[in-house]
Swiss-Prot record:
Key words of the record: Membrane, Transmembrane, Transmembrane helix
InterPro entries according to UniProt: Neurensin (IPR024883)
Superkingdom in the source lineage: Eukaryota
Compartmental location: Membrane
Similarity comment: Belongs to the VMP family.
Name of the protein described by the UniProt record: Neurensin-2
Transmembrane residue ranges: 65-85, 116-136
Residue ranges of coiled coil: none
Length: 202
């Protein structure tokens, strides 16, 4: 029995369309993941399918990663400022004690504050990233995945089942012709019913 549809391997190059179905580009995968959708490039029916995840878990981990990255950058900047800038030495002088002590002490206190704030921000970012990785590993981020046909740009409905003429094998035709439930053909062939009237002799 011949196949009416062209057979295309899932890993390789299609002869008709010259399309590679074995991989996808990383920017395309990142774009689909950011939108919360994943487009399957190949399926046996040649219908593009879009897998939609739940919006809240996807949005939750994206916002968490973004905020954690921002906190991490700010923490690293604060730590770099606190440890890279050298502190000033406090000058002990009785005549200028009241005028020189406050600026130097404030400067050193600001450097110490930068170190503390930087360490706190880095710790919070690490905790947020750890929680996000734990939720991803536990599978909470990837639940309730739904599949639906991908509608083209022309808003035309996707043809799932195409009407094709049924092609049966000769053996099936012979079996169906020899079925006992079928009416046997008449030995006299097709008979036409004719109504005739006797002709009167004039």
């Amino acid at each position: 029995m011949s196949c009416s549809r062209p057979c295309v391997c899932s890993h390789g190059t299609s002869v008709e369309e010259s399309t590679w179905y074995g991989f996808d580009f990383y920017p395309n995968l990142f774009y689909n993941d950011w939108l919360g959708t994943t487009t399957l490039p190949y399926n046996p029916e040649r219908i593009p399918i879009r897998y939609i995840n739940r919006p809240w878990p996807s949005l939750c981990w994206k916002v968490t990663v973004a905020v954690a990255s921002l906190f991490l950058l700010l923490g690293v900047a604060a730590l770099t400022t606190g440890y890279a800038v050298p502190p000033k030495l406090e000058l002990v002088n009785e005549s200028k004690f009241s005028s020189m002590e406050d600026p130097v002490a404030d400067y050193n206190q600001a450097l110490m504050t930068c170190r503390v704030v930087g360490a706190t921000l880095c710790g919070v970012a690490g905790i947020m990233l750890a929680v996000c990785l734990f939720l991803i590993a536990s599978g909470w981020m990837f639940q309730d995945i739904k599949a639906e046909p991908l509608v083209t740009e022309t808003d035309s409905p996707v043809e799932v089942f195409r009407d094709e003429p049924e092609k049966l094998s000769p053996a099936f035709h012979e079996t169906s012709s020899q079925s006992p439930f079928l009416t046997p053909p008449s030995p006299f062939g097709q008979q036409s019913v004719q109504t005739s009237q006797p002709q009167r002799d004039l």
